[in-house]
Amino acid sequence: MSDNKKPDKAHSGSGGDGDGNRCNLLHRYSLEEILPYLGWLVFAVVTTSFLALQMFIDALYEEQYERDVAWIARQSKRMSSVDEDEDDEDDEDDYYDDEDDDDDAFYDDEDDEEEELENLMDDESEDEAEEEMSVEMGAGAEEMGAGANCACVPGHHLRKNEVKCRMIYFFHDPNFLVSIPVNPKEQMECRCENADEEVAMEEEEEEEEEEEEEEMGNPDGFSP
């Protein structure tokens, strides 16, 4: 009986030794000593997961980048073909624009020549008008100079209080003429008195001529 019970004790003893070893480990290492190892373990796990996530994201970006490059290449080919067509159209447009510019330049030259001819004709007409005006002014100045001293113009009689005055330009290119007296008032009165005397002398001469004609008509001096 005692022999049969020994293995059971041994078995139970072995189990008891295992449980005792575990308890001894817990008692052998304190919690403070285990925490640093746990921290390093957590750090390693986090770092590994972060690197794996980063590699996954990089793979996605590389795939997207390759797609973008392929799309850009296709678009560039299309744009190059479109640009070639546009260049051809631009060349044609430039050709026609050059022809239009040549035509416009030709017509512009003709217009410029016509304008030059019109300007020359206008200048000639203005010169002729200025010459005519200068000739008229010269003639008028001579006539006014001749009558400046209130002398009687041949074939005309000066009325009373009539005074001849010179005409001058008020502006450089006048639109109207302004007459102003040149001589003082006393001289004008004197000249007007002389004009009255001349008129009186002419009347006396006319009366004398009439008397002579009457005498010629009556040579004997008798009235009819």
From Swiss-Prot:
The keyword GTP-binding does not apply. P185A and B result from the expression by tumor P815 of a gene that is silent or expressed at a very low level in most if not all normal cells of adult mice. Expressed in testis and mastocytoma. A motif (Nuclear localization signal) lies at residues 5-9. It is found in: Nucleus. Residues 76-133, 189-224 are annotated as: Disordered. Its main location: nucleus. Keywords: Nucleus, Tumor antigen. One of its GO terms (cellular component) is nucleus. Residues 82-133, 195-217 have a biased composition (Acidic residues). Signal peptide: none annotated. This is Tumor rejection antigen P815A. It comes from Mus musculus.
